């Protein structure tokens, strides 16, 4: 069902290097990052949902300059009975 592409990144779990992907999507034409889905497209879900959302939100706000919080939204989708975090990154504003 899910397959990585230039606009779709799959992550088994939250890892700090996800910020590189957020920046890359904002600097190009945007994309989505699904956290809780492995590289083969298998839905695993997120175990520490609230903790991971808070870490992710804080990392995007505090670590990326200029601020891109207006271009990145964090959502939770229920897929195959599992909670998955979706980071929807829009194309950033040109400088």
Predicted regions and their residues:
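Conserved N-terminal catalytic/coupling substructures associated with nucleotide/phosphate chemistry
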Residues: 1-95
């Amino acid at each position: 069902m899910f397959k990585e592409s230039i606009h779709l990144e799959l992550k088994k779990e939250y890892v700090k290097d996800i910020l590189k992907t957020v920046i890359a999507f904002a600097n190009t034409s945007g994309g989505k990052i699904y956290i809780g889905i492995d590289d083969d497209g298998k839905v695993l879900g997120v175990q520490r949902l609230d903790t991971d959302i808070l870490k992710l939100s804080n990392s995007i706000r505090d670590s990326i300059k200029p601020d891109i919080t207006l271009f990145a939204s964090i959502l939770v989708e229920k897929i195959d009975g599992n909670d998955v975090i979706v980071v929807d990154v829009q194309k950033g504003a040109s400088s």
